[in-house]
Each structure stands twice: as C-alpha cells, then as structure tokens.
C-alpha cells in the first residue's frame, strides 16, 4: 500500500502549470502531518522542477533561467550559460540564491553561444514569458536545447505551459531529436486538461546555429498548426456532442407578448399568471 509520502509526491509531480503552490497547500491540509510532510517531499519537488523546466530569477536580476537535468551541478546547484552564473535552488519555494560566476568549460562553447543567440531571437519573437537554455551533454559530445513558455490566467481559471526539449550529436550532418509538450488546465466549474506530447526527429545538413534553430522553428510552427486543426475538429465533433441541445419548436416568438411568457416574467420580476 502506498505511503502518505508516495501519494503526496504524486500530487506534487502532477501539479498543473502555475498551480504548484495550490497543490502544496492542499497537501498540507489533507495530510495529518500538515506542513511537517514538506521536507519529505524534496525529491518530488526536484523532479517536478526539472521535468517541467521550472524557471527562477537570479538574485538582483529580472531575467528568468531554467532548472533542468541538463544544467544541474552537484547538490541543488545549476548553471546558466548566457549569464555565466551558477546558483542554488530551493525546490520547494522555487527561489534561487548563492549566485556565483560560472565559466562554461566545453569544446563546443562557440556553437553553444551561437545557438543561444539564434534561440533567443526565435523565443522572443514567438513565445511570451519564455526562458531558454543551451547546454553541453553526454561528455561534451552532444548539445541540449531547451525552451519553456508559461501563460498563467488564474482570474480566468486557466493556466498553460509550452515545453520543448531537443538534443543532437555534434557531427555534420546531424539529427535533432526531442519533443514538444503543451499542457493547459481549465478549471472554471469543472476540470479540463490538455496534455500533448509530440516526438520529433529532424535531419539537419549543417551544424550551424542558424540551420538548427530554423529547422526547430519550422517544426514548432507545423505542430502549432496541427493543434489548431485538432481544436477545430474537436469543437465540431466530440465537444459539440457534449453540449446540451435546446428543443426546436419552430414557433415564432411574439416579442410584444414576451412579458406573458414565464421567462419574461422571471427577467422582469413579474408574477406568473
């Protein structure tokens, strides 16, 4: 039988975009240990932040940086190539501290910096509230490209997150593999979640940053168009069948007598006849 920590951990790791704090509050309320259970959930918070590409602001900075398995150092420290900074993360509060200078030690440093420049231009053009990163992986024989964009609208009862993770070996020609994930949660008078996962396998003839990011941008645009078509099909198909159909009486409404109808009386506050 699953323990309380296991169950609470699954809640943490399944938190919708932008709603981790709400889930944490619910966990404290639902468990007999209350806030005392939170330290036991540290591994779950770490997995959530790395998987969801959580973002944090560096001390004294406004730009957000990524948390992921690809830029992880020892302990709870991570590094950001663009700002040349390493930092410590409190996975529960999603706050960064103890920032230090960090110099990228990679034989592919020039390629990584070029990719960051091209990726930054692409991200700023197409994704609001985004963060991105490029990191050496697999003993410096490959490169990982990460992009996340969050859109939170709790006043309208929805939150969403776009995540893209790519990697490719440093060879020419090369193949970029990865996936695009889109998660949206709508929770006004209900609970509807959209979770998509699109695997990608992209052939790139040149190892230049422009060629790689251009190929990625095309794949993301194509997937967005696929999603748009899927939404139209759902609206006209499955969702249409869920809507309550109003009866068809084929009778004209005599508007001058609308006050005599029950609906008209309800609206005007009159009494029924």
From Swiss-Prot:
Record note on quaternary structure: Component of the F-actin capping complex, composed of a heterodimer of an alpha and a beta subunit.
A biological-process GO annotation: mating projection actin fusion focus assembly
Lineage of source species: Eukaryota, Fungi, Dikarya, Ascomycota, Pezizomycotina
Family membership: Belongs to the F-actin-capping protein alpha subunit family.
Function: F-actin-capping proteins bind in a Ca(2+)-independent manner to the fast growing ends of actin filaments (barbed end) thereby blocking the exchange of subunits at these ends. Unlike other capping proteins (such as gelsolin and severin), these proteins do not sever actin filaments.
Species assigned in the record: Aspergillus oryzae (strain ATCC 42149 / RIB 40) (Yellow koji mold)
GO-annotated molecular function: actin filament binding
Keyword Cytoplasm part of the UniProt annotation: yes
Domain of life the protein comes from: Eukaryota
A cellular component term, taken from the record's GO annotations: incipient cellular bud site
Sorted UniProt keywords: Actin capping, Actin-binding, Cytoplasm, Cytoskeleton
Subcellular location: Cytoplasm; Cytoplasm, Cytoskeleton, Actin patch; Cytoplasm, Cytoskeleton
Protein known as: F-actin-capping protein subunit alpha
């Amino acid at each position: 039988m699953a323990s309380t920590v296991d169950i609470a951990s699954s809640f943490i790791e399944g938190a919708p975009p932008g709603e981790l704090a709400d889930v944490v509050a619910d966990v404290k309320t639902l468990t007999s240990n209350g806030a005392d259970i939170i330290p036991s959930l540290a591994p779950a918070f770490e997995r959530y932040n790395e998987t969801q590409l959580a973002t944090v602001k560096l001390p004294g900075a406004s730009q957000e940086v990524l948390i992921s398995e690809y830029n992880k150092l020892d302990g709870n420290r991570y590094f950001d190539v663009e700002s040349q900074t390493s930092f410590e993360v409190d996975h529960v509060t999603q706050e960064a501290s103890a920032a230090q200078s960090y110099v990228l030690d990679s034989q592919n440093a020039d390629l990584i910096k070029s990719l960051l420049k091209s990726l930054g231009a692409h991200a700023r053009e197409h994704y609001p509230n985004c963060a991105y990163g490029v990191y050496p992986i697999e003993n410096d024989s490959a490169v990982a490209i990460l992009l996340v964009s969050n859109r939170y609208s709790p006043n309208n009862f929805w939150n969403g997150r776009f995540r893209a993770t790519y990697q490719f070996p440093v060879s020419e020609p090369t193949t970029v593999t990865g996936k695009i994930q889109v998660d949206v949660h709508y929770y006004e008078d209900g609970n509807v979640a959209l979770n998509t996962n699109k695997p990608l396998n992209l052939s790139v003839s040149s190892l230049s940053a422009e060629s790689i990011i251009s190929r990625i941008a095309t794949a993301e645009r194509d997937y967005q168009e696929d999603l748009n078509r899927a939404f139209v099909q759902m609206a006209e198909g499955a969702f249409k069948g869920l809507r309550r159909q109003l009866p068809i009486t084929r009778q004209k409404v005599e508007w001058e007598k609308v006050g005599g109808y029950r609906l008209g009386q309800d609206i005007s506050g009159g009494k029924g006849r």
